């Protein structure tokens, strides 16, 4: 997900997106732990998306 797309969203939408990403991250970690994860690059991708959303939430809180 691009930061430009995220900047257009409201705080409520960002919180919803963050919750969805954290759920996805949990599911991916469980798959990795059980050896079922085929696409390991998704772990890194979701982790960075979570960081992007958290950064934008912090920016919007300060503004």
Curated annotation (Swiss-Prot):
Stored Pfam families: Ribosomal_L29
Record SUPFAM superfamilies: Ribosomal protein L29 (L29p) (SSF46561)
Assigned keywords, A-Z: Ribonucleoprotein, Ribosomal protein
Coiled coil, from the record: none
Domain of life according to the entry: Bacteria
UniProt keyword Ribosomal protein, yes or no: yes
Keyword Ribosomal protein assigned: yes
GO MF terms, alphabetically ordered: structural constituent of ribosome
Alphabetized InterPro entries for the sequence: Ribosomal_protein_uL29 (IPR050063), Ribosomal_uL29 (IPR001854), Ribosomal_uL29_CS (IPR018254), Ribosomal_uL29_sf (IPR036049)
UniProt record similarity statement: Belongs to the universal ribosomal protein uL29 family.
Identification of the protein by name: Large ribosomal subunit protein uL29
Taxonomic classification: Bacteria, Pseudomonadati, Pseudomonadota, Gammaproteobacteria, Enterobacterales
